[in-house]
Amino acid sequence: MKLVFLGPPGSGKGTIAKILSGKLNYYHISTGDLFRANISNATPLGKEIKQIVENGQLVPDSITIKIVEDKINTLANKDNFILDGFPRNINQAKALDTFLQNIQIINFLLDEAILIKRLSGRRICQSCGGIFNIYTLPTKEKGICDLCKGSLYQRKDDVEESLKIRLQEYHLQTKPLIDFYSKNNRLNNINASKDIDGVEKSLIEIISKY
């Protein structure tokens, strides 16, 4: 099944995608990971993306669509994957429909107060990319990854000033996707304020219907 995860930054999309990709053998495609890989490799697109992200802005549709479509085309199994962070707006959603069919949308619903707490507490492993949270998913040892013992860091766009910009962009561009996908009965809502096990259980129940 082809899944798209929708929801504001910090709603747990990435964490749940990583968990289910292991349990259900789905490939997890994160636009954030794709962007960071290009930045790390200092590709021409990566240099452009780096400056855009550091300014707290969203990467242009033309770049995002190309990176995602190219990645999907490299997959051996194009029927079982999770898209995390794409599409972000109607233009991207329409572009996605031109090269993918039979997509189910998972919409993560979360109270904004909980959202801010999650975002400010998020920590990421510098070595393996593992995602933790000092409030909701703390590591056994402070600042150290449970998976590989790498050091944890806080992303620049998880600090308050960048958070405000990201949430504004979400409300302006991403939320209309809910209406877009509701019209053709592809939208499945999940209460993302539950703990990780609860969200995972809800998602598996949805997947089992299709």
Swiss-Prot record:
Residues that coordinate or bind Zn(2+): 125, 128, 145, 148
Residues where AMP binds: 31, 36, 57-59, 85-88, 92, 155, 166
KW Cytoplasm (keyword) present: yes
Signal peptide: none
InterPro entries registered for this protein in UniProt: Adenyl_kin_sub, Adenylat/UMP-CMP_kin, Adenylat_kinase_CS, Adenylate_kinase_lid-dom, P-loop_NTPase
The protein's Enzyme Commission number: 2.7.4.3
Catalytic activity: AMP + ATP = 2 ADP
GO cellular component: cytoplasm
Region (LID): 121-158
Pathway(s) the chain acts in: Purine metabolism; AMP biosynthesis via salvage pathway; AMP from ADP: step 1/1
Binding residues for ATP: 10-15, 122, 131-132, 194
Molecular function GO terms recorded: adenylate kinase activity; ATP binding; zinc ion binding
Main location class: cytoplasm
Keyword entries, A-Z: ATP-binding, Cytoplasm, Kinase, Metal-binding, Nucleotide biosynthesis, Nucleotide-binding, Transferase, Zinc
NMP: region residues: 30-59
CDD domains reported in the protein's UniProt record: ADK (cd01428)
A Pfam family it matches: ADK
PROSITE patterns: ADENYLATE_KINASE
NCBIfam families hit by this protein: adk, PRK00279.1-2, PRK00279.1-3, PRK14526.1
Oligomeric and partner information: Monomer.
Function: Catalyzes the reversible transfer of the terminal phosphate group between ATP and AMP. Plays an important role in cellular energy homeostasis and in adenine nucleotide metabolism.
Name of protein: Adenylate kinase
Source organism: Borrelia turicatae (strain 91E135)
